[in-house]
Amino acid sequence: MVTENKEIPEAAKRDLKIALITLKYTQSNSVCFVKDGQAIGVGAGQQSRVHCTRLAGQKADNWFLRQCPKVLDLQFVDGIRRADRDNAIDVYIGEEYMDVLADGAWEKIFKVKPEVFTREEKRAWLDQMKGVTLGSDAFFPFSDLSLIHISEPTRLAL
């Protein structure tokens, strides 16, 4: 291992194993982000490893945004189906959040109209993500992760 630190923590070893097992069962040209024993973002089937990494990074960011107290505290209407709840969360944390916050839409999903999850709030939450493992089924054809344009929080969490 080419690094000054020659010891890998047990949690990192576990996450590396999970990344490799996950990658074994995905399409070729795959990338996987793992945190705390679970795959949180997988990118596969794209034309380049750059695109796979970007896709996996976006999924990892979305996974972490779902852990934010502002998202966990959303109050859904009684009887909402799990798929509808999950889709509403995905839209809420994304760029098209007004699709679920607009008058006439939010009442079908939420008991109380949620506040907008601002870009600044998302950035502040994502900046707290640490200890993410990145696995790939092959080498990266570039030397610097900044070249692949994954989100800054995901890059810093690696």
Predicted ranges, named:
Residues M1-S30, V34-I40, S48-K130:
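Long, structured protein-protein interaction/assembly regions in large complexes
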Residues H51, S143-D144:
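Residues that form or flank phosphate/diphosphate-binding pockets in enzymes
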Residues E121-K122, D144-S146:
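Short glycine-rich, acidic/polar surface loops and turns
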Residues K130-V132, L145:
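A short pocket-lining beta-strand/turn micro-motif at the edge of beta-sheets
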Residues L134-G135, R155:
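Short glycine-rich phosphate-binding loop at a beta-alpha junction
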Residues G135-S143:
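Extended C-terminal subregions enriched in glycine
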Residues S146-I148, E152-A157:
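Residue-level detector of conserved catalytic or cofactor/ligand-binding positions
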